[in-house]
């Protein structure tokens, strides 16, 4: 699996090879494989944050509570996984309503591959973002990689659902709308909006 992930990341980084990665992986996995990749990507992300937290204390001393940090990262990882499936299935539903001809398991698998690649690429930047003098640059790099990730998601949606470019973007916007609505509801329930 490590060799396969390494190949994915190398092709993910090169925008010219990214479409061929989507084409090659399309139809090769389902819910089970996608879930495994999603769990691995959440572990990579949690590990990056776990490593970066003690580094940040060099510049702003706090009491380091590893158990509390692990518990928080576990809860956030679980919430992230649920959100991934809700957004992915919303994109699938919108894409299907717009004439898409794919399966949800293929879409979720491709999104999981793109998510894993994105997490592996951003992990070093997340760790280095704890170093105060360069934190802004590292967070800027993470943001730019996130924007590139939208391109990867676009290719995955377009490839897995056989959609035109505009319909693929519309499907992605439906997923974004769900995120905004959920955050608005959570904000209203917490009295923040």
Labelled PLM ranges:
Residues 18, 84-98, 144-160:
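Membrane-cytosol interface at the C-terminal ends of transmembrane alpha helices
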Residues 24-31, 101-104, 158-167:
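Membrane-interface helix-boundary motifs at transmembrane edges
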Residues 30-37, 68, 72, 76, ...:
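Residue-level signature of transmembrane alpha-helical entry/exit and packing/kink sites
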Residues 44-56, 86-98, 120-129, 178-186, ...:
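Alpha-helical membrane-inserting segments
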Residues 60-127:
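Alpha-helical transmembrane segments with an aromatic anchor "belt"
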Residues 128-193:
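Terminal transmembrane helical module of multi-pass membrane proteins
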């Amino acid at each position: 699996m490590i060799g396969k992930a390494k190949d994915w990341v190398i092709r993910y980084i090169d925008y010219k090879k990214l479409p061929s990665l989507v084409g090659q992986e399309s139809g090769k996995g389902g819910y089970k494989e996608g879930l495994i990749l999603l769990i691995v990507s959440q572990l990579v992300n949690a590990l990056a944050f776990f490593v970066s937290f003690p580094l940040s204390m060099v510049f702003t001393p706090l009491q380091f509570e590893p158990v509390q940090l692990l518990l928080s990262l576990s809860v956030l990882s679980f919430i992230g996984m649920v959100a991934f499936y809700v957004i992915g299935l919303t994109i699938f539903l919108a894409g299907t309503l717009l004439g898409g001809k794919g399966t949800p398991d293929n879409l979720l698998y491709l999104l999981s591959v793109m998510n894993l690649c994105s997490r592996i690429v951003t992990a070093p930047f997340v760790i280095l973002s704890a170093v105060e003098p360069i934190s802004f640059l590292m967070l800027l790099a993470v943001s730019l990689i996130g924007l590139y990730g939208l391109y990867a998601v676009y290719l995955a949606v377009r490839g897995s659902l056989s959609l035109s470019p505009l319909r693929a973007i519309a499907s992605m916007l439906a997923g974004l709308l769900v995120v905004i609505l959920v955050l608005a509801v959570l904000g209203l329930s917490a009295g923040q909006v």
